[in-house]
């Protein structure tokens, strides 16, 4: 039975947060169940974009701090490592660590920040699609990886949590290469992300669900209080709890479908046990869930193939530029796997005929200047 602990946590106040964390970690056996004393441990937060903690796009630094404190009690060698959105270089990493609140929060703790941008090619014979991949070096060097994710919606994957967070072990713009190789949402979410998670094998996954992000996540949505911390040895089981909390059918999430397909969890979730506080107490019934490409795929599967292919191309949501907000920074152009974005005197311009609908541009725009527009015909059909 895969246990998932859910504990109420009303705020990021240190004392309030630590009290909730201690209950949660005790529920699942204590931190020493998941790491060995004196081991090398990498903490992998979600630092997808350079935003302040209160904006709800990244793992809150108080969670990182509390986990570090527990690991230091075990004399572990602790390192914070992440490959955020955009180029993977030292100056970019430093900016993310600073803006996301980690440098200030971890001041005084014997914790290292990773600035080594060396990439390691690794092999995973158990993988289905990514048997060979490049990962950031600290992941390959670590004895254990602790996965600290954020509860958010996602315009491509619909939901991002434990499994999806591990995409951040792929260095910098190599993420764009993978997106381009595996363009279909079902291929990327149901298979590739599962291959990456299988390689990393986090010993523990903890979700920051005190404040979540709804709507146009993972970076341009709205902050919404949920008031929980969640932890599990299984990121796949944890994601079922995450979906339940935001009133989302787990079967609409590609990583969940993949977890079931590869027998990592049962299709009726009977192998998952929620412990701690009653999860039903925290469900946000009106949480804003985005329309995503998977919704259109499910529609197209109901149609004859020719019509289904047309539906995929015509009514799948498309990225649209808000030129009042665009500052011509070019981050969308750098992040675009298909290389179909140019910057002119007006701002970013997307070649929609060649756009692969991965929405990396939307995800990494620092000004929320890119919106995902839903086709009106889908609303009518739906």
Model-derived regions, located:
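N-terminal and secondary-structure boundary signal
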Residues: 1-327, 333-338, 342-347, 352, ...
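Extended, alpha-helix-rich binding/interface surfaces that flank or overlap catalytic cores
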Residues: 356-357
């Amino acid at each position: 039975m895969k246990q998932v602990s859910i504990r109420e946590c009303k705020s990021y106040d240190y004392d309030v947060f630590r009290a909730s964390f201690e209950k949660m970690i005790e529920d699942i056996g204590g931190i020493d169940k998941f790491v060995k004393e004196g081991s090398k441990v990498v903490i992998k937060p979600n630092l997808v974009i350079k935003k302040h903690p209160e904006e709800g796009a990244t793992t809150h630094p108080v969670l990182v701090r509390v986990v570090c404190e527990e690991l230091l009690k075990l004399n572990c060698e602790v390192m914070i490592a992440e490959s955020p959105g955009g180029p993977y270089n030292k100056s970019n990493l430093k900016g993310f660590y600073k803006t996301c609140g980690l440098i200030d929060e971890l001041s005084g703790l014997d914790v290292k920040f990773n600035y080594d941008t060396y990439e390691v090619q690794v092999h995973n014979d158990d993988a289905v699609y990514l048997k060979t991949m490049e990962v950031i070096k600290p992941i390959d060097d670590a004895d254990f990886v602790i996965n600290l994710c954020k509860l958010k919606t996602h315009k491509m994957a619909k939901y991002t949590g434990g499994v999806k967070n591990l995409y951040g072990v792929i260095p910098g713009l190599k993420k764009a290469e993978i997106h381009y190789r595996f363009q279909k949402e079902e291929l990327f979410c149901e298979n590739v992300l599962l291959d990456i998670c299988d390689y990393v094998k986090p010993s523990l996954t903890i979700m920051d669900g005190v404040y979540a992000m709804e709507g146009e996540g993972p970076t341009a949505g709205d902050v919404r209080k949920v008031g929980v911390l969640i932890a599990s040895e299984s990121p796949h089981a944890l994601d079922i709890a995450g979906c339940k909390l935001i009133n989302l059918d787990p079967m609409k999430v590609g990583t969940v479908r993949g977890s079931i397909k590869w027998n990592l969890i049962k299709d009726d979730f009977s192998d998952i046990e929620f412990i701690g506080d009653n999860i039903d107490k925290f469900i946000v019934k009106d949480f804003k869930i985005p329309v995503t490409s998977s919704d259109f795929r499910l529609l197209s599967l109901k149609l004859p193939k020719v019509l289904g292919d047309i539906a995929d191309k015509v009514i799948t949501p498309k990225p649209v530029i808000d030129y009042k907000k665009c500052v011509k920074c070019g981050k969308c152009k750098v992040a675009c796997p298909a290389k179909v974005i140019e910057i002119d005197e007006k701002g970013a311009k997307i070649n929609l005929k060649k756009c692969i609908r991965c929405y990396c541009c939307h995800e990494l725009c620092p000004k929320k200047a890119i919106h995902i527009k839903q086709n009106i015909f889908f609303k009518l059909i739906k």
